[in-house]
Curated annotation (Swiss-Prot):
The chain crosses the membrane at residues 41-61, 72-92, 125-145, 158-178, 184-204, 208-228, 265-285. Induction: Expression is low in vegetative mycelia and up-regulated during development of the basidiocarp. A motif (NPA 2) lies at residues 238-240. It holds the Pfam family MIP. Residues 314-324 have a biased composition (Acidic residues). This is Aquaporin-3. It comes from Laccaria bicolor (Bicoloured deceiver). InterPro entries: Aquaporin-like, MIP, MIP/Aquaporin. Keywords: Cell membrane, Membrane, Repeat, Transmembrane, Transmembrane helix, Transport. It is found in: Cell membrane. The gene is AQP3. Belongs to the MIP/aquaporin (TC 1.A.8) family.
């Protein structure tokens, strides 16, 4: 039985000289990290851009008494679609973290380089900030109108920096009188723990029930489920989404948009929850005696047969062969 031939894109599709020249520069190790960071920023941009847009319709629609513009159900779908677009467009370049807690977990459990992790996290937060800036400018007229209506009604101070106010489109806040900090912590921790278990299962090569092609949909569904069930009690799920969007809210509205003690819960709780989920999955659900599913094996081979990876492996083999052929001193 003959082996499946390895065909790279350049073998079947010719690019122009300018693009080939750019690709040679872009793919140098000294430069390629910037492409990976760009992909991480773009992925978070997708996730945040679609989610915030739907949230803006919900918040502004409620203030302006325009029913039917959005709903929690629609917001969950918007974030889910953003995740699908992020993974589909960007994961092949960066590996598809799109969340600081995932990057930190990969650094601890999968040997991801710490310096690269810092770059990824900065890029992720930047992607969320840029998405916030665009959403704000696209909705600015209605946001300003909503602020004026709140001031005219005399409820600006009590509504503006809550989930029901224009600032709540971007930064995450507790619903006044409806949630305590300990319960917000519990809500965030449990949702992030469950979400991380789903992510780890989607990455498990022996998980034949979740082939690689289905992993984006499974992960997106987990995010949507958390939003549908627990957004009202307050969840963040993603440090980049929280920090990047909160920084933007601070840029527009100043310190009043900070969010108080809850901001620490929204930004940080997902990290220990994800790490604990990774430990639980590795200890209780990973089984090295299981067979690697064929779809996962194909996915792993595609990654391993990347042209630069193969070239590097061949170069390393040549160096090893050259070293072994040298006469050893007696």
């Amino acid at each position: 039985m003959s082996a499946t031939p390895i065909i790279h894109l350049r073998d079947v599709k010719k690019r122009t000289g300018v693009l080939n020249a750019w690709e040679r520069v872009r793919n140098k190790p000294q430069v390629h990290w910037a492409m990976e960071c760009f992909a991480e920023a773009l992925g978070v941009f997708f996730y945040v851009y679609f989610g915030l847009g739907s949230t803006a319709a919900w918040v502004i629609g409620n203030i302006l008494k325009q029913s039917g513009l959005s709903s929690v159900f629609q917001i969950g779908f918007a974030y889910a679609f953003g995740i699908l677009f992020a993974i589909g467009v960007c994961a092949a370049t960066s590996g598809g973290h799109f969340n600081p807690c995932v990057t930190i977990a990969f650094t601890i459990f999968r040997g991801f380089p710490p310096l690269k992790a810092v770059r990824y996290i900065v890029a992720q937060i930047l992607g969320a900030y840029i998405a916030s800036a665009l959403v704000y400018n696209q909705w600015k007229v209605l946001i300003v109108e909503s602020e004026l209506l709140l001031k005219q009604a005399g409820v600006y101070e009590t509504t503006m920096f809550t989930p029901n106010g224009p600032a709540g489109i971007f930064a995450l806040y507790l619903l006044p009188g409806a949630q305590t900090l300990p319960r917000a912590f519990l809500n965030e921790f449990v949702n992030c723990f469950v979400l991380a278990l789903v992510i780890w299962a989607a990455l498990d090569p022996t998980s034949f029930m979740i082939p690689p092609v289905m992993a984006p949909f499974i992960i997106a569904a987990a995010y949507a489920g958390s939003i549908w069930g627990y957004a009202v009690p307050a969840i963040s799920l993603n440090s980049a989404r929280d920090i990047g969007c909160r920084l933007f809210a601070l840029t527009i509205w100043g310190k009043s948009a900070a969010g108080g003690s809850y901001s620490a819960i929204a930004a940080l709780v997902n990290i220990p929850a994800t790490l604990l989920a990774a430990v639980v999955y590795e200890l209780f659900l990973v089984d090295s005696d299981r067979v690697v599913a064929g779809s996962h094996l194909e996915f792993m081979n595609v990654a391993a047969n990347h042209r630069r990876h193969r070239q590097q492996a061949e170069d390393d083999n040549l160096v090893e062969a050259d070293d072994s052929s040298q006469e050893k001193p007696v």
